[in-house]
Amino acid sequence: MMAGATFALWVIYGNIFVISDTLVIGILFVSGIFTLLFLVVGASTEAPDNPTVIDWTLSLLSAACGIYFFLKAQVIADRISLLEPLTPLQLFFGSALLVLTLEATRRTTGMGLTAVVVAFLLYNLFGYLLPAPFGHGVSSYTYVLDVLVFTTDGLFGVPIQVVASYVFLFVLFGTLLAKAGGGDFFFNLASALTGKTRGGPAKVAVISSGLYGTMSGSATSDVVTTGSITIPIMRRLGYTRRFAGGVEVAASTGGSSMPPIMGSAAFILAEYTGVPYREVVYVAIIPALLYYFGVFGQVHLRAVREDLRPVSGSVPTLGTTFRLGWMFVIPILVIISVLMIGYSPTYTAAIGAASVVVAAALSTLTRMSLWQIVEALGETTLRILPVAGACAAAGLVIGGLSMTGLGMKAANVIIAVSGGDPILTLLLAAVITIILGLGMPTPSAYILAAVLVAPAMTRIGFPLLESHLFLLYFAIMSALTPPIAVAAMAAAAIAEEDPFKIAFDAVRLAIVGFLMPFVFLWNPAILAIGSVPEIILTVVGAVAAVAALAVAVEGMLERQVPRLERVGLLVGAIVAVAPQTLIAVAGIASIAILIGRRLYRDPSVVKGDETQSGSDGVECGVCGPRAICEPADPPEVPEAKER
């Protein structure tokens, strides 16, 4: 813990007070992370908390590499890459760092990403044996090592630089906020807003997981953290195991698309596109809100379909929630304000982290002790380990791609296969990005897609920012997409259900996330790009489309919706987001007529949030959600049967 806290303090000091070149920052960060990583994430699964001789050896070798590269940083920076031969010491330490990166990747992310990196390394070395269009010139081992380790195009390139600066500081912000009690505040806020409505616990999961996910940036971490609370509650309410897990997975996965933080991949997107991070946040707001509106709507309609009315019980009120946790709103407002003023993400994150400590000190209930701050620093370092390992590996891939030109070759192949057709190109881009993201962290999936797929999209005319945001969305969605669906696997352990069943329910709940990228490339006004009237009409149309999609998917309002009407709603949803004004208005009107007609027939749909509990009874999990039993003493509610 103390070693991690010390490292975190160095990162803060280096980013805020020391101006240094990117090579030195990358060298010190990578070597420091690896030194800790091999001691924390052990090679032995039998005794992970007891480092072996191998672990200590790798840790010391990481430190030695860091010392050598730091002492020789100026020599490395001054040498002419690919022309001046590497010295024996450079060959040794460069090779050692390459092997250490592969092992660090294996320990933090598993064999999936490690196999990808090894495959690209083999391609760099032996790709000259392949026929056109994928063959390249002969590359010796020293040539490959020179590019990957001794320049800022490989290991010490953009991904690791981003992690070493503002990603680390934003993770610190989230960790401090959680340590001070911000996580409880957000959960209580979600409970106060939706706890007494139909399907309340599931709606609490949607809101709280979204709020937590924007800070963590990891769907799996979010599922484990919030799902351990929300999934059992949803089960007791009457949701099936698979649906409860699916709700948590869909809500947690979307957190990486929710401003203002959006996880680490969004920072990398800003670096690759050259677009200020505040602009990335600005254009991502409407799609993220629509995503959660879609999940929220399906959760409510499922509660209607299953007749899962609210259960009586203690739910925090808004007044109590804000009275005890109002100070946690301050850091969020600080982050947003500083970003909008124009400060860099690094300074924004640092100021935000400091504001958490200051805001928490405003109440004796939330005031942080020195030891809690030290714990938060140490936990930040631990949480950054898998991200750093993945981004270091991604740096090796990017270096190899730039060296061999594979990125442009892949773009040529995509365009050739699609024939330059925009729709087919987008479908190929979506499928490739999801495949690249299966079992991999979102940053790695996005980076690979940005290098391999984005050039094809921009070459046929799609705008740069929208193209990269398209790829980011599908990199995020890969976390819940079968057959791997790492977030669903995490939920399966909590829900005690087949991860494939959870994943399929999560995909249905997250359907807006799969469709939204196509929509904002078709109609950029949904990204708040364009005139105010265009944006307003598009937002209204998108809200109507998402509502129609939720009804069509669940087939429910207060009663079953006939198939023909569901088809009509799907068609209306497509038309409502069209960039042409008259067509969009026609789509909105058709949705309003279909849903309004159904609501007029079934007016009870708007009255369905009464608590299902009589004055003397409680809901019985044995008799079913419609039954009201009258025991002498309120019993403990047994777990509901599977539906």
Q: Model-derived features: where do they sit?
A:
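Membrane-interfacial loop-to-helix junctions in multi-pass transporters
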Residues: 87-92, 153-166, 193-205, 237-243, ...
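Core transmembrane alpha-helical segments of multi-pass membrane transporters/permeases
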Residues: 64, 103, 108, 118-123, ...
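Transmembrane alpha-helix boundary signature
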Residues: 44-47, 68-83, 108, 128-138
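Long, contiguous bundles of hydrophobic transmembrane helices that form the permeation core
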Residues: 282-383, 486-574, 601-602, 606
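Transmembrane alpha-helix interface/packing and boundary motifs in multi-pass membrane proteins
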Residues: 106, 174-178, 209-218, 250-256, ...
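Hydrophobic mid-bilayer segments of alpha-helices in multi-pass membrane transport proteins
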Residues: 2-5, 24-38, 54-63, 91-100, ...
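Cysteine-cluster motifs in flexible loop/terminal segments that predominantly coordinate metals
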Residues: 617-632
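Hydrophobic transmembrane alpha-helices that form the pore/transport pathway of multi-pass ion
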Residues: 187-255, 261, 265-268, 274, ...
